[in-house]
From Swiss-Prot:
Domain of life: Bacteria
Transmembrane in keyword set: yes
Keyword Coiled coil: no
Organism: Photorhabdus laumondii subsp. laumondii (strain DSM 15139 / CIP 105565 / TT01) (Photorhabdus luminescens subsp. laumondii)
Cellular component, GO annotation: plasma membrane
Topology of this chain in the membrane: Multi-pass membrane protein
Record key words, sorted: Cell inner membrane, Cell membrane, Lipid transport, Membrane, Transmembrane, Transmembrane helix, Transport
Function in brief: Catalyzes the facilitated diffusion of 2-acyl-glycero-3-phosphoethanolamine (2-acyl-GPE) into the cell.
Compartments, record wording: Cell inner membrane
An annotated Gene Ontology molecular function: lysophospholipid:sodium symporter activity
Protein name: Lysophospholipid transporter LplT
Amino acid sequence: MNASSVVQPLLTRGMKAVLVSQFFSAFADNALLFAILAQLKAQFYPDWSQPILQIVFVLAYILLAPFVGQIADRFPKDRVMLFANSFKLLGAFTICLGYDPFLGYALVGVGAASYSPAKYGILVELTDGDRLVKANGLMEASTIIAILTGSVVGGFLSDWNLAIALLVCALMYGIAVVANFFIPRLSAVRRDKGWNLKKMLTDFASACCILWHNKGARFSLIGTSLFWGAGITLRFLLVLWVPVVLGISDNSTPTILNVMVAVGIIIGAGAAARFITLKTVHRCMPAGVLIGVMVVIFAVQHSIWASYVLLIILGIFGGLFIVPLNALLQESGRQTIGVGYAIAVQNLGENIAMLLMLGLYSLVIKIGVPVVTTGIGFGTLLALTITSLWIWNRFQRN
């Protein structure tokens, strides 16, 4: 055993602080979403407006994509995370004070867009090598546990008292802000970068091109974009599927079903960290195809207990699929354009996929397609798309 392995364990003080900050920030993100959805339902907004809420959030990611990567690399990432969580806190308070929920959630989106490159980029500064996959596994597990608890708390509190639900979300963002102060001060990776707007846009476009021409990065970008686009669409599909198929109209049941997915992703993320390395990352592809298959199976059944089991299995496949792809992209970014830029490009791809999938989903619901039919079509399309990516990637490697 060498000295570096003794003095640099995976769970350092900095890593623990990052995980705590991520947990409470993600907790609030998910609780707030379900609280606002309950607010929209209480105020009789149409069903198709629900995905519009997420589209407003996603637009912040897309519009800020050329800039947040440079911010993450230009400033210490611990300070960037602090600023981003503070902006989320501002958005939550805006909603608590009675302002338009779409406006408040857009402010939360600005904070989230700034936060993402820093939270993943900081992992590279706190660990390295194959431990990066394990660090990503911990980050994903922390995030999914937050989704699990945040979704449930958001749903149950919204059924009980909507105002308290919103205040709890703001409190959780406040705790995340405090946790950021316990992350050791880090140095900026690329302090020499300037702030010329035209150059930033040009640099970002160049970064997109560099990553796209890297086989590993391109594969990861497409895979993670499909995963998160599908994941957020499934979340809204569940909100409509539950009352139609199960006949349950509360706010907590859809959150519990989302929790089942989260439990599965925790298991899958742990398995990915244990059995998949950067050299064997392509083992994740069968799991990606099976995500779509599980969506189809889930959509056509009518049992709440079967729903729990099917969504846990779906989540396991999701964890096995996403964790190796995230690690592959970060490693590709470190070798080319910097992790901050790489994560910003990844966010752009993922959020464009979310925007397109949510827009299509909103349109399908607006024109009256039954929710079960929507689920079958969604799962089939996802499975076929990931299968095509798998075949295309094998062709590229050969």
